[in-house]
Amino acid sequence: MGAYTHVDFHESRLLKDKQDYLSFKSADEAPPDPPGYVRPDSYVRAYLIQRADFPNTQSLSVTLSIASNKLASGLMGSDAVSSSFMLMNDVGDYFECGVCHNKPYLGREVIFCRKYIGGRGVEITTGKNYTSNNWNEASYVIQVNVVDGLAQTTVNSTYTQTDVSGLPKNWTRIYKITKIVSVDQNLYPGCFSDSKLGVMRIRSLLVSPVRIFFRDILLKPLKKSFNARIEDVLNIDDTSLLVPSPVVPESTGGVGPSEQLDVVALTSDVTELINTRGQGKICFPDSVLSINEADIYDERYLPITEALQINARLRRLVLSKGGSQTPRDMGNMIVAMIQLFVLYSTVKNISVKDGYRVETELGQKRVYLSYSEVREAILGGKYGASPTNTVRSFMRYFAHTTITLLIEKKIQPACTALAKHGVPKRFTPYCFDFALLDNRYYPADVLKANAMACAIAIKSANLRRKGSETYNILESI
């Protein structure tokens, strides 16, 4: 066991970085290093890399299968190729395990385990005979059980690697990585042959008990660090990447909420929207809308762990409807879900009604999404009483998203409920069941209208139980 130096692969979500790959056609045409960036060494690193996110999980079982082709052509005498998986939490601590093939030593392949916690890295590379560090297999199946901060590794069902302890207990994502490290200074994206990339080919990566879906990710194009295949870069949907936006100072001249909400960057990942409230943003399929979730702590929001579990169930619902994990399908699902709960979240009879549904597009087909099935996915089969309203506290994560959709007339307001409570037309976008507004973003009259709508809704519910009902929000002014 010894210390090692962490080298970042520089995951990026900027559209500009994707565009820079188009002109990165030789080592001499590499984009300039960012200001302040210091290269860790003189090696060039090229990556095949994918990522999968899942709800915060303490214990996992990971099985990595790798095919080794030691005689592959194209490697230089000093090249090294490794394939591995990397478990990571939200603060960047990680555990990595895999196999590294070193070209100068034809029979030398190293099984390595690494942990990187709080800025300090430790690596274990003991070989199967504990002295030479050598492996020489045609294929590897690495089984790793991570339980309560301890990783136990078994290779090809026979050899047990040294345990790694002191690991985090809050894993939220996993990376699948094949990496080429070379002294060749003339490398660039797209210059690698299939045989060179296939020296340590990952055949499969299984994770339990969570369900995962891998997607290609973008790396910042640097002269000595980049995505190995240009097609992987081009396959990344533009709508899933961020577009830098100018910082607009707070206006005192009556700027409305719509303008304030539009000057943000874009993404379409529901998990990130929940995980980074205050920085969470979402771009819908037509790339017109931008929403910034308010950075406030409030116990009226569902706890993040539960919210991410709901997100996983919603993803499964999309798959069951013939959709996929693409930004377009997930964006369509989010819009449809919001529309359903704007219209039907306060209905008196929450049992199934055929009319409580909306039509959307999933998997390039028109499908119906019903209020009952989305509500069931959110509740996860738990219909008993709880100290909070699970549906409402989950949907509050999408409050500002909903307001922008209503302002842009992308969804319909609940006209019957609004008319029943006498909500003036100009306050329509701000008065719905799960609206939760931040006074940094909205003028006083909007905040007052929202507060009064909440008060009238509560009062109406109480009065109904006594045989009377309030009909106009203005009655309480």
Swiss-Prot record:
Cysteine pairings via disulfide bonds: none
Task: List the record's Gene Ontology CC terms alphabetically.
Answer: viral capsid
Q: Name one Pfam family in it.
A: Closter_coat
Q: What is its main location?
A: virion
Tell me where it resides. Answer: Virion
Question: Looking at the keywords, is Protein biosynthesis present?
Answer: no
What's in the keyword line of the UniProt record?
A: Capsid protein, Virion
- InterPro entries annotated for this entry? Closter_coat (IPR002679)
Q: Does the keyword tRNA processing apply?
A: no
Report the function annotation for this chain: Minor capsid protein that encapsidates the 5'-terminal portion of the viral genome.
Family designation: Belongs to the closteroviridae minor capsid protein family.
Q: What is this protein called?
A: Minor capsid protein
